C-alpha cells in the first residue's frame, strides 16, 4: 500500500452495497478480523469480492494485550491464516484489555500506566509479533475513568513502543477526547508521541454527553477541532494512510464521501508542505 494520501474507510455490512456498486471508492478498507475469520456464505462471498478490489488492514478487538492470562494461541492461529489469506500487511490492536480470567468483558478497558504493565505488555507484543511473523501496531485508546498511574499516558505508550519494537496506530480523535476529558493539551500530547513509528492514523467522530464528558462513538461526523488536530499531526510526521471510522448511525453515502474528501484534502496539503520543507 502506498503511503501517500491514502484515505481508507472501515468496511461495514450496513454500507457493503456502496463498496460493491462502486458508489464509494476508498483507497483501502479496514475490518475487525474477528468478524470475518472463517466466515462463509453470502457475507463471505461479499467480503472476498471487496478485498479483491481494495487493500485490507486488520484492526483487532479481542487480542486483549493487557490481560494477565496467556495469549489465546488458537485465536492467533486463525488470525495468522486470515492475514495471509487476504494479504494483510498491517495488523493493529487496542492498547487495552478485554478479558479477565478468560472471560470476555465486551469492552476495551484501559491499562494502568505502570512500569510492570510496560514489561508485561511488551513481552506479550513480542510474542504476538514472533508468532504472526509481522509487526503489531498498538492504538492509543479513549478512557473515561482515572487510571492508576506511575507515569503519563504518553510515557506509557512510548515505553511500550520502545521496549516491544511495535508500531503505533495513532487515533487522533482519541487524543482529542482524552485531552478534553482528562484536562491535557492534545497538541502537546501529539508532540510527545513516537511519530516515526506511526503505521497509520484513525479519524472519527465523538459525542458530547455532558459539559465535561465526550465519548468516542464512531457514530458522528468529525468536528472541526479534530480536523485541526489532524492537520497539526500530519505536519509533524511523514505521510501515512488515514482511516475514517464509522461503525453505526451511518449517514448518506455522499456525506461519507465528503468526509473522505476532507481528509484527503488535508493530507494532500501536508504532502505539499513536506515537499518544500
Model-found features: residue ranges?
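Acidic/histidine-rich catalytic cores of soluble enzymes
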Residues: 129-213
Amino acid at each position: 500500500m502506498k503511503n501517500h494520501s491514502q484515505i481508507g474507510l472501515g468496511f461495514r455490512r450496513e454500507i457493503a452495497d456502496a463498496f460493491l456498486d462502486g458508489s464509494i471508492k476508498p483507497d483501502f478498507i479496514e475490518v475487525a478480523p474477528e468478524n470475518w475469520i472463517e466466515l462463509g456464505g453470502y457475507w463471505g462471498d461479499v467480503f472476498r469480492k471487496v478485498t479483491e478490489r481494495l487493500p485490507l488492514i486488520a484492526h483487532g478487538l479481542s487480542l486483549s494485550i493487557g490481560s494477565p492470562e496467556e495469549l489465546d494461541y488458537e485465536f492467533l492461529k486463525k488470525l495468522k491464516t486470515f492475514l495471509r489469506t487476504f494479504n494483510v500487511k498491517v495488523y493493529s490492536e487496542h492498547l487495552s484489555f478485554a478479558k479477565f480470567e478468560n472471560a470476555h468483558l465486551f469492552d476495551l478497558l484501559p491499562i494502568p500506566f505502570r512500569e510492570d504493565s510496560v514489561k508485561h505488555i511488551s513481552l506479550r507484543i513480542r510474542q504476538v509479533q514472533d508468532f504472526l511473523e509481522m509487526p503489531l501496531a498498538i492504538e492509543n485508546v479513549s478512557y473515561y475513568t482515572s487510571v492508576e498511574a506511575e507515569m503519563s499516558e504518553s510515557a506509557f505508550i512510548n515505553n511500550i513502543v520502545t521496549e516491544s519494537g511495535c508500531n503505533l496506530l495513532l487515533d487522533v480523535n482519541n487524543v482529542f477526547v482524552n485531552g478534553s476529558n482528562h484536562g491535557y493539551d492534545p497538541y502537546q500530547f501529539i508532540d510527545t508521541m513516537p511519530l516515526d513509528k506511526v503505521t497509520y492514523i484513525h479519524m472519527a467522530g465523538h459525542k458530547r454527553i455532558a459539559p465535561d464528558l465526550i465519548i468516542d462513538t464512531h457514530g458522528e461526523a468529525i468536528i472541526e477541532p479534530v480536523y485541526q488536530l489532524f492537520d497539526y499531526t500530519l505536519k509533524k510526521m511523514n505521510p501515512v494512510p488515514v482511516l475514517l471510522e464509522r461503525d453505526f448511525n451511518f449517514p448518506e453515502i455522499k456525506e461519507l464521501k465528503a468526509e473522505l474528501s476532507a481528509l484527503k484534502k488535508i493530507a494532500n496539503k501536508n504532502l505539499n508542505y513536506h515537499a518544500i520543507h
